[in-house]
Amino acid sequence: MAQKLVAQGGETGDVWDDGVYDNVTKVYVGQGQYGIAFVKFEYANGSEVVVGDEHGEKTELGVEEFEIDSDDYIVYVEGYREKVSDMTSEMITFLSFKTSKGKTSQPIVKKPGVKFVLHGGKIVGFHGRSTDVLHSLGAYVSLPSTPKLLGNWIKVEQNGEGPGLRCSHGIAQVGNKIYSFGGELIPNQPIDKHLYVFDLETRTWSIAPATGDVPHLSCLGVRMVSVGSTLYTFGGRDFSRQYNGFYSFDTTTNEWKLLTPVEEGPTPRSFHSMAADEENVYVFGGVGAMDRIKTLDSYNIVDKTWFHCSNPGDSFSIRGGAGLEVVQGKVWIVYGFNGCEVDDVHFYDPAEDKWTQVETFGVKPNERSVFASAAIGKHIVIFGGEIAMDPRAHVGPGQLIDGTFALDTETLQWERLDKFEGTPSSRGWTASTTGTIDGKKGLVMHGGKAPTNDRFDDLFFYGIDSV
């Protein structure tokens, strides 16, 4: 059964619907003065080739053809929609199609107007509106009947005095408790420096008692991880772009310790990524005082020393808002933002101090940043994120998306896990961690920024039933 994705664009023109087929085999995109003049698709229906109608009108500006290999399929479409000239309704001004094997109809470039994405599985049909131009485009998406990484989302009941509405904060789990630190309600205005603790047995929040070197700044864009019974938090900034250093919090004694002052550790930053294994805490990327960062640093909790990992190379771009997870001894960097969203995937091998870029395939999520992520066995699970920056940067909401995807780090294949229902709403700038609730391991996600620029206060868990 195929899922119909709502057409993106204007509401002018004749409605057309090509229907659902086994696969899309060829795409024709006609260029016009202001954008896309027409589209036409060819489909496979069993052994039969079905040639669809032209939607819009040809011009003398040429037609681009994109042929899909017989063992491949389209997994997402990116485009831009905009009111142009004296039009009263939006038209489609740019389209790019990408397949499961990474083949792209044309490079995806930033354009004026509003970016949109059609994604979530194997695309098996299209629909939309057109006059003498293409006004809107939607798709039909087919999903595998049962994902290899089977699970489901639950909304966790919350009681007590919790973090409330916020985004750009950090969470981590120790035993049967989830901790939350930092964040904002109003853009660029940190809320507090309380350490909130959620008891999974009572489903109740409280504020943890704090002694010792309590972080001196209330901060946003902070990250936090746990190793054993200890929390580690690094960076984050206040409203004047002053930064926090590197701290630990002993959950058995409720004591903060300043491990590395801000001027002595890795480059001060916010909106970076953190991960940990049994002996090391990793800090990657983020936004410094002058520019984004692409370095990876590790802190050995036994030796209490920092190690500056090798440079990932010139082809690896600076970025913030990336996914960072440790899987089977390797440190994985997934996607992020370098001025625009990117979709490259790399891993770092601590044993060899070496970087490797990998090519992933399958039902691949489109470029995004500031998404939720977790490591579950050999998989990296992600949810949501931002697909296009707001013109007002962090002050605005940006274009946010939903969708739960998993990357198998052994086969390098992506799959979509949810099926467009029972899923948290679109969001980004969430706090997330790998966690265990009611005996299941999965992705824990709290809060985040909504497409309306409001903040969420909900707590969700994607629990894995089988791997």
From Swiss-Prot:
Residues 2-143 form the Jacalin-type lectin domain. Signal peptide: none annotated. Its EC number is 4.8.1.5. Fe(2+) binds at E386, D390, H394. Keywords: Iron, Kelch repeat, Lectin, Lyase, Metal-binding, Repeat. The active site is at R237 (proton donor), R292 (proton donor). It is an enzyme of class 4 (lyase). GO terms for biological process: glucosinolate catabolic process; nitrile biosynthetic process; seed germination. Pfam families: Jacalin (PF01419), Kelch_KLHDC2_KLHL20_DRC7 (PF24681). InterPro entries: Jacalin-like_lectin_dom, Jacalin-like_lectin_dom_plant, Jacalin-like_lectin_dom_sf, Kelch-typ_b-propeller, NSP1/2/3. A (Z)-N-(sulfonatooxy)alkanimidothioate binds at R237, S270, R292, G321, V370, W429. Mainly expressed in roots, and, at low levels, in seedlings and leaves. Observed in seeds. One of its GO terms (cellular component) is cytosol. GO terms for molecular function: carbohydrate binding; lyase activity; metal ion binding. Kelch repeats lie at residues 177-225, 230-276, 280-329, 331-375, 379-434. Belongs to the jacalin lectin family. The proton donor differs depending on substrates. Specifier protein responsible for constitutive and herbivore-induced simple nitrile formation, especially in roots. Promotes simple nitriles, but not epithionitrile or thiocyanate formation. Converts allylglucosinolate and benzylglucosinolate (glucotropaeolin) to their corresponding simple nitriles in the presence of myrosinase. This is Thiohydroximate-O-sulfate sulfur/sulfate-lyase (nitrile-forming) NSP3. It comes from Arabidopsis thaliana (Mouse-ear cress).
